Every structure is written in C-alpha cells, then in structure tokens.
C-alpha cells in the first residue's frame, strides 16, 4: 500500500487568509505542532517577501528536526538565493520554485512567451539544484494550462533536476474527474515521469479541494498539499486533516495510507484556530465541535446499541479527548511536567516554572483542569512571553449607568512601567481606551470575538481581537479565566504588534 506524504503550507498559503497575521513566535508554535503531527514537508514561508518572513523561515529551519523545511521562491535568482540563506540550516532543506504556465498568466501577468517560460523553468531549477538537495517545481495555474505545454514544462523541470512536481489548481477551477485525468495524462506524456514525485495543491473556490486532492491520489499523486482547517487565500485550501482521515478510513478504496500522526489532528486544528483567530465551523468534518455529536433520537439509539451504526470515525483516532479530568491544585511539578510532555510540550526550566506558576494560579480558581485547559494555558503563556508589554494591574470602576472607568498598568521588556486611565460606555471599551492612551495609538477595533475553551462556569475564556490603523491590520488573542483579563491581554497582544509594525514601516 502506497504512503501519501503531506506538504503543509499553513505558515505560507494559510497565513495569506484575510485578517491573519502571525508573528515569529506564533509561527514557531505551529511549526512544532506540525512536526508532532508528522508532516513530511512544511512550507515555512516566502523568504524573499520581507525581512520578517526571512527571519521566521530561518528560525523554523534551524529548529525543526523531523521534517523537511521549505521556502517558496519565484523563478528569480535573487529569490532562490534568499530562500537558500533562510533554510540552509535545516536538517532537510527544500526549495519550492514556481512559475505560471497558463496562457492567461503568461500573457497578462508574466508577459512572457512559452519559450521564455521554459527557459526560465530550466534556469531556476538548475540553480536551485546547485544549492538544495531537493527542489520542488510548481506550474502555477496548471489546471488552466494547455495539457501539451504543461507536459513540456514538467519534462523541462525534471530534466533540470526537480525532484517534486506540483500540479496546482491555483484558482479552484477543476473537478475530480478532470484532475484525475490530468495526472493520468502527465503519467503517459512526460518521458521522465518516474524520476519525480508528483504532488497536488488544491484551492476550494468551488468547494472541491478535498475531493480533487483525493482524485489526484487516485491518479498517481504521492504528495498532497494543503493547510490545517483548510485556511488560505480566498475560499482556502484543501484541509489536510480531511484528506488524511479520508485516506485512512477508505484505504480499501484508495489503496493508500496517510503518512501522518492522526491522533495529533485535534490539537493541531485547535492551535491553528486560536492563533489565527479563524473559528472552526461546528459542522466541519473531522475537527468541528459537532463532528462526533448525535442529536437525532434514532441516531442516538443506534449508537448506544452499536457505535458503528452512525459513526465511521472513532473520536480518539484524531485525538478528540475523552479524558476530562487530568490535574488539580494538589498536583506537583513533576506530574505537571510529565502530563505536558504527554501532550507534546517541551520547555526549558525557566519556561516550565512560568507555566507551572500559571497552572497553580488557575488550579486555585478552577475545580478541574482539563487537557484543553492545559493547551490553552500553554497558548496563553507563549503569547504572554512574546509580548512587548505585559499587564501588571487592571482595575475597572463603575461610574454611572452609562460610563465605566478603567485603570491599566503595563510593563515593557526593559521593566519600564506605564499607567493610565480612561472611561468608556462599558468595561471593555474603558480598558481598551486606557491601553490606547498608554501606547499612543488611535486604532479601530475591527473585530472582537470571545470563545469558551472548556465547559462550566469556571471555564477559560479565549478572546480574539483585530485592530486596524490606516492600511495596517493585526490580530491578537488572550486567554484567562476572567473575561476582562482575557480581553485586555488580547488587546495588548494586538496593540504591541501594531505599534511595532507602524514603527517598522516608518
């Protein structure tokens, strides 16, 4: 049975989702979780896009030990050399070079002839191969490219040294029958077909990204590209968790097995959702809150008698926790550390002490600590540690029926303390006005969302905010048992990002 490899582009294509803005620390968190998920290749970013992207890609490349780290690059020497500088320290570095091959892209975007495109493919892949052990070439807009020219372009790339050939459905245009046929056509029409691994990359504009990816596997693709939760440009990408579980459950049909640690799916989905602020729909396959819920009386009766009557996926397969109570206020440092290791977290002694202290504070207020609480705790403490400013004091006073006053004290990385107060029509508005006064910002609150992480009156709150000032928009999140504290943390997280970004642009 053939093994299907997964190339995750959450950190590159996924981050292009409108409103998503991840900092370096957040990208590293996701990269480490993707490593635990067993992703074969992770596209860490587009190193030539900006200095920030370059540094993020470089840090991920120097950190990840058990996956290939790849950078995107245009078919330009400067891009390719910049990508090399970013990922050369990786255990397994890879270049991902792309060039459009469809008539519409060649005519209107590239202003290049077919001969020029073929020459550029050959030169860029050849250069890449002189620097990288593995080169992937993508024929952008492949599904709207003339088949004979696509086959010619692919052959040129393989002869130049490309190890992986990606056939992307860049605008989500194709359907499963067409995509399957395209892979079969290339298998028959590319003389050097056997010298490369073929990959698929599907967008969801017509809602067929997962179906098209599975059709590509039927057609001979050995690598599937996509993102966690299907996030990405426009309508998003193929959701890798859906493709992987479909291959596993229906291996009788696809004759293929996903190369992925399926039990890490839920944790990965949750992390990506909380860091990006993109809420997973309740009815989403595999990772939605209702994925394993049964409300119909007939269905409930059937499941109670025999679970397979209405449930084809065991929740534990994808890491859906059935074990609620894990730790409490009497748990010691050793038990806490071992439990965190079990969940896949490793940290230095200083990091452990900080997180354990946060755990003890939470345990004093919360009767039961669940795995979701622990993951949220790690998420919140990581964001807290990465912030330029941290909240040391927060007070809200009732002034009148329509006005409240908030006093906020912040401390920066150098230990400088800033304090101010402001009023607002509610507690949160007053807090946000005070923070704006301290940081000297005049930004607009573009989005505010609150989500309960666990059940019960003592549940942790996760707040996501998006701030906008002029053309700049950033997001931030905060986790705390108190909604006002979580809201303040989220605002400080985002405001610190916005202030840094504005200073960088200036």
Curated annotation (Swiss-Prot):
Residues 390-506 are annotated as: Regulatory domain. It is an enzyme of class 2 (transferase). It is found in: Cytoplasm. It catalyses: 3-methyl-2-oxobutanoate + acetyl-CoA + H2O = (2S)-2-isopropylmalate + CoA + H(+). GO terms for cellular component: cytoplasm. PROSITE patterns: AIPM_HOMOCIT_SYNTH_1, AIPM_HOMOCIT_SYNTH_2, PYR_CT. Pathway: Amino-acid biosynthesis; L-leucine biosynthesis; L-leucine from 3-methyl-2-oxobutanoate: step 1/4. Pfam families: HCS_D2 (PF22617), HMGL-like (PF00682), LeuA_dimer (PF08502). The keyword Manganese applies. InterPro entries: 2-IPM_HCS-like, 2-isopropylmalate_synth_dimer, AIPM/Hcit_synth_CS, Aldolase_TIM, LeuA/HCS_post-cat, LeuA_allosteric_dom_sf, LeuA_bact_synth, PYR_CT. Keywords: Amino-acid biosynthesis, Branched-chain amino acid biosynthesis, Cytoplasm, Leucine biosynthesis, Manganese, Metal-binding, Transferase. Its EC number is 2.3.3.13. Mn(2+) binds at residues 13, 201, 203, 237. Its main location: cytoplasm. The keyword Cytoplasm applies. GO terms for biological process: L-leucine biosynthetic process. Its cofactor is Mn(2+). GO terms for molecular function: 2-isopropylmalate synthase activity; acetyl-CoA C-acetyltransferase activity; manganese ion binding. NCBIfam families: leuA_bact (TIGR00973), PRK00915.1-3 (NF002086), PRK00915.1-5 (NF002088). This is 2-isopropylmalate synthase. It comes from Bacillus cereus (strain AH820).
